[in-house]
Amino acid sequence: MSEIKKVVRTLTGRVVSDKMNKTVTVLVERRVKHPVIGKVIRMSKKYHAHDENNECHEGDTVQIEESRKLSRTKAWTVSKLVERARV
């Protein structure tokens, strides 16, 4: 039989809060063309992501991937730390 590979959704964003235990808030920005005006605008959304070792801090750029529901608001996990925040 053929193996079925599951496609995992990944997003890249900036950590805006690390005050919770094993959880970070990640701000993901995307650029969208306005349907009427035609201007390119920035839209953003915040995701709560699971950070098992509490290694991400505010300002870091991280890659998150979709996972099973871990709590009421948390369904993403931090898969990779892309860049540390410049202090």
Curated annotation (Swiss-Prot):
UniProt GO MF annotations: rRNA binding; structural constituent of ribosome
UniProt keyword RNA-binding present: yes
Pfam families: Ribosomal_S17
GO biological process, alphabetically ordered: translation
Domain of life according to the entry: Bacteria
Keywords: Ribonucleoprotein, Ribosomal protein, RNA-binding, rRNA-binding
Presence of keyword Transcription regulation: no
One GO cellular component term: cytosolic small ribosomal subunit
InterPro entries: NA-bd_OB-fold (IPR012340), Ribosomal_uS17 (IPR000266), Ribosomal_uS17_bact/chlr (IPR019984)
Similarity-based family: Belongs to the universal ribosomal protein uS17 family.
Oligomer status and interactors: Part of the 30S ribosomal subunit.
Function comment: One of the primary rRNA binding proteins, it binds specifically to the 5'-end of 16S ribosomal RNA.
PANTHER family with a match to the protein in the record: 40S RIBOSOMAL PROTEIN S11 FAMILY MEMBER (PTHR10744), SMALL RIBOSOMAL SUBUNIT PROTEIN US17M (PTHR10744:SF1)
UniProt name for this protein: Small ribosomal subunit protein uS17
